[in-house]
């Protein structure tokens, strides 16, 4: 089996640094990563309460702060009955023109931090008229 030449040692080193930053910023080894779509962060806070730690996504090496409407710029740690869950309140999209590396940086940092489970959400519209992507809330459905 050959190694894909795009996966250079520098790329792997970047992920190790980013993973270490995630672990030191959020005080411990997380069990899972959830990446939220537009407007979903408030619903999560209603369900799980305040996070135990927060770091700006842009402070993690290689991760670009989200700019899309409805996307937040935080990585939050929540204590749940099943362990620590990291929640990104937004993400960078490929259509923003930055290329695949910044788009996948958070996922690669999560793997380097020891996370083996992830959920990627999307709030791409609604069948109910009058609900925009950025105004979605669980109480309006």
Features from the language model and the residues they span:
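Metabolite-binding pocket within alpha/beta catalytic cores that recognizes anionic/polar moieties
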Residues: 2-141
């Amino acid at each position: 089996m050959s190694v894909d030449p795009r996966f250079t040692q520098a790329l792997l080193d970047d992920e190790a640094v980013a993973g270490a930053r995630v672990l030191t910023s959020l005080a411990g080894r997380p069990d899972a990563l959830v990446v939220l779509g537009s407007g979903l962060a408030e619903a999560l806070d209603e369900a799980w309460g305040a996070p135990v730690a927060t770091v700006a996504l842009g402070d993690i090496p290689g991760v670009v702060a989200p700019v899309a409407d409805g996307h937040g710029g935080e990585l939050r740690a929540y204590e749940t009955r099943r362990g620590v869950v990291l929640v990104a309140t937004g993400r960078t999209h490929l259509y923003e023109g930055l290329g695949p590396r910044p788009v996948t940086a958070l996922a690669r940092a999560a793997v380097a931090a020891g996370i083996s489970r992830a959920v990627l959400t999307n709030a791409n519209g609604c069948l109910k008229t009058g609900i925009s992507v950025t105004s979605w809330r669980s109480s309006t459905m």
